[in-house]
Regions:
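Acidic, surface-exposed loops and disordered segments
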Residues: 1-194
C-alpha cells in the first residue's frame, strides 16, 4: 500500500500526518464489531456547542441490507470504489435545537464528529473516506429520517489496498503527491513566525 504521510510545515500528531482518504480498499477485509464500535464512539465524544450533540449515525457493515441501500444512493465515481469498503457511516445532523430555532452550529459540530471518526479509524490501522457525492434526499427517505435530520456525508471505512488495483485516473489520484494550501494562504491574521 502507498505511504501517504503528509509533509508539514510544523510538527503535528503522527496519526494526523498519516491520515488520508484512499479509494483502493481491501474488499476481503471484514471490520470487527469492536473496531466499528470504537470508531463511532470516537465520533460520539466530539466537542459540541452547549453539549447539544446534534450528530446521528447510521452504521452498516458490508454484506448487510443497509450497506446495499446506502451504496445505491452513492453518486458517480463513489459508486465504483466504495462498495469495497468494510463499512459505511452515514453522518447526519439535526437542523434545529430544543428551542425550535435553526441550529447554527449543528453541521459544524457534526463535521468535528466526522473528523473524530476519521482519526479513530486511522489510529486502528484503517482508513475513512468522506463522500459528499450522494443523493441526500433519496438516502434521507431510505433511512426514514425525520424532516429535521439532514444527511451530511457518508464515510467509507476500510483497510487500504495497493493502488495498482485501481485503473486510469483513479490510480493517478491515488498515488499523486498529497498537498494542502500553505499556511500563509489560509491563516488570514496572526500567523506565527517559525
Amino acid at each position: 500500500m502507498t505511504s501517504r504521510i503528509a509533509v508539514t510545515s510544523a510538527p503535528i500528531l503522527p496519526v494526523l500526518a498519516k491520515r488520508w482518504s484512499p479509494r483502493s480498499l481491501d474488499a476481503s477485509y471484514e471490520i470487527s464489531d469492536q473496531d466499528l464500535l470504537s470508531i463511532v464512539e470516537a465520533g460520539r465524544w466530539a466537542p459540541s456547542a452547549m453539549n447539544v450533540q446534534p450528530w446521528r449515525f447510521s452504521v452498516a457493515k458490508r454484506g448487510s441490507e443497509l450497506f446495499g441501500k446506502i451504496a445505491s444512493h452513492l453518486g458517480g465515481f463513489n459508486a465504483s470504489w466504495s462498495p469495497k469498503s468494510s463499512a459505511y457511516v452515514v453522518v447526519s445532523a439535526f437542523t434545529n435545537g430544543d428551542s425550535g430555532q435553526p441550529g447554527t452550529t449543528s453541521q459544524f459540530d457534526s463535521g468535528i464528529s466526522a473528523g473524530h471518526i476519521l482519526i479513530q479509524a486511522e489510529a486502528l490501522g484503517l482508513h475513512g473516506h468522506v463522500m459528499g457525492g450522494i443523493d441526500h434526499v433519496a438516502l434521507h427517505t431510505e433511512l426514514g429520517y425525520p424532516e429535521n435530520l439532514a444527511v451530511l456525508v457518508v464515510i467509507a471505512i476500510g483497510k487500504g489496498a495497493p493502488a495498482e488495483l485501481l485503473e486510469g485516473g483513479a490510480y493517478d489520484r491515488e498515488v499523486a503527491m498529497r498537498s494542502r494550501l500553505p499556511l500563509d494562504e489560509i491563516v488570514l491574521h496572526g500567523l506565527p513566525n517559525a
